[in-house]
Amino acid sequence: MKLYFHPASTTSRPVALFAADHGIELEYRVIDLLAGEQAQPAFGAINPNQAVPVLEDGGFRLTESSAILKYLAEKAGSPAYPRELQQRSRVNERMDWFNTSLSRELCYGFLYPQIMPSHKRADDHTQQQTIAWAKRNATRWLSVLNDRWLGDNRYVCGERLTIADYLGIAQLTLGEVARLDYSRWPNVTRWIARMKDRPTWSSVNDAFYKLLVQPSAQVQFEAL
């Protein structure tokens, strides 16, 4: 199997971490997002969405992190995507929630406009309004994650690690670029620490820290 990805991207890191944890052998093909390779015709022919990751398994091609995680979990027979209907539905629910609620506000509304020039709004007023709106909503979703999804649980679906944790942890740790303080949400900080304690975390996320986190150390960002 081949994975088109970028090792620092929020969407690629969940797949790479899951594959590393499960010993899944992938041929990694880096798409240079910083150079705009995803917008070139050659990659557009692979994924018309012009986004990573993309998984190729023989003649089968699959896009979207959540879909790829489910596919790999099925192939590996991983308990991280349980077969029992209600447990699996809960994992699907949490993954949809991360993608449609938390990521929309925390990543696309609050962080990306501050981190990525291509996401910055056209003028300062619109930029400030966008960040302020997203900040209000992101804090709400962080409280839902802290109080309802996590609570006293070890992971977002209960006591067992699932692919929903792999998806969500990449979104939350994007906040490290802007040095976000999650201490108001102690269950979230506990869960982040647990996920980062995985033996594969450092090697999989090395490029993320070198390319995004470390270069932003002196940049000023809006706080939550």
Which positions does each model-derived feature cover?
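Conserved beta-strand edge residues that scaffold enzyme active sites
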Residues: 33-34, 189, 209
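Active-site-flanking alpha-helical
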Residues: 73, 171-172, 205
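Acidic/histidine-enriched, glycine/proline-rich intrinsically disordered or flexible terminal extensions
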Residues: 208-224
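GST-like fold's C-terminal all-alpha helical module
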Residues: 94, 99-197
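GST-like domain detector, emphasizing the conserved glutathione-binding G-site
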Residues: 1-129, 222-223
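Juxtamembrane membrane-interface segments at transmembrane alpha-helix termini
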Residues: 200-201
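Phosphate-coordinating loops and pocket residues in cytosolic domains that bind phosphorylated ligands
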Residues: 45, 197, 206
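Generic structural signal for helix capping and beta-alpha/helix-loop junctions
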Residues: 13, 36, 192, 212-213
